[in-house]
């Protein structure tokens, strides 16, 4: 059988782990299995067929660094349609007065358009995998399948403000989606049960749904301890801190990943560590909504797996994970009053291997037999000159626009900054039309 091989040639290769560094190597990928087969220095020629009927395709990485694809571990992809719609407001007012009313008018077509726009932005800026909490999930799944990226998806369940029938319908939808789409797109798509938060889903509903999710080994993802106004009602109503409340509902296990964790007390950090649950840090969104500064150094010291996420484009307002990892490093230093806190390599780890680990997805590392979720970052720019320290540059100076090639599961999604799997012009045009239509319905 003919084998198709991709070889990424001539690049600096980022190696993470205990001793982060850079090596000079070519990376060989089996495009059928989607895995890295070899990392070496052997020269290869472009577009050739060898004696074993092997088709070889090359990507030029000269003057570039090859690194694991970035993982956006918490977002709401279709919220790209609400980018810039409602800014400069605190979280609860923003949600209740602007975002939730707008989302009530979202159509399946709009969610598809917004998700495709988000995926274009993510591929261009080096994200190969993401976690998406939203609705009209069949449209989200279709967009992911066509684009070639990797994701863990779920229906964002909200029961607050609904009668029992509507609440149970939403709850059932969350469970049905998690069961229906797990393993879709040749396993590139995984699922989770995704209650919005501990305050927007009632306790009795959580008890019922979490029990079913656990029976099916479905991970759980939710917003936790994002703002004081989210923490206080739980303390007032249950006389417990949020993560103690969550633990009592069996919502704190090694497969679960929580978004934000801004207002965590020491015992809650210990609970996360003991449970093996992961925390997704969303620094840009937390800054924009004035939610606070998550205690990332303390979480890392406790051994908690920390990933990074952009949150939705309505609260960020972009999906560039290079921005996010820089924000994480700098905000971590401010929060700890320590310039050595959250160093460059640690921030990159959170945006790659940390994200893959939190989501329970492959990726996040470059080694033989690992999945080929890779990006090539072009260092030939004034803002990346001189290259005293490539790892430092990736954390503090690189931008999403520096990404030259993007590969996911051994498939080239972007080559020389041209996306291969999506008609970008059509996506942008459709998203603009859907966004304007949404706003017209709102008015």
UniProtKB/Swiss-Prot annotation:
Pfam families, per database record: Amidohydro_1
CDD domains named among the record's database cross-references: ATZ_TRZ_like
Catalytic reactions of this protein: S-adenosyl-L-homocysteine + H2O + H(+) = S-inosyl-L-homocysteine + NH4(+); S-methyl-5'-thioadenosine + H2O + H(+) = S-methyl-5'-thioinosine + NH4(+)
Details of cofactor binding: Binds 1 zinc ion per subunit.
Binding site for Zn(2+): 74, 76, 223, 311
GO molecular function per UniProt: 5'-methylthioadenosine deaminase activity; metal ion binding; S-adenosylhomocysteine deaminase activity
Cofactor list: Zn(2+)
Sites where the protein binds substrate: 103, 196, 226, 311
UniProt xrefs under Gene3D superfamilies: Metal-dependent hydrolases, Urease, subunit C, domain 1
EC number, as in UniProt: 3.5.4.28, 3.5.4.31
Keywords: Hydrolase, Metal-binding, Zinc
Family of this protein: Belongs to the metallo-dependent hydrolases superfamily. MTA/SAH deaminase family.
Protein task: Catalyzes the deamination of 5-methylthioadenosine and S-adenosyl-L-homocysteine into 5-methylthioinosine and S-inosyl-L-homocysteine, respectively. Is also able to deaminate adenosine.
Name listed for the protein in its UniProt record: 5-methylthioadenosine/S-adenosylhomocysteine deaminase
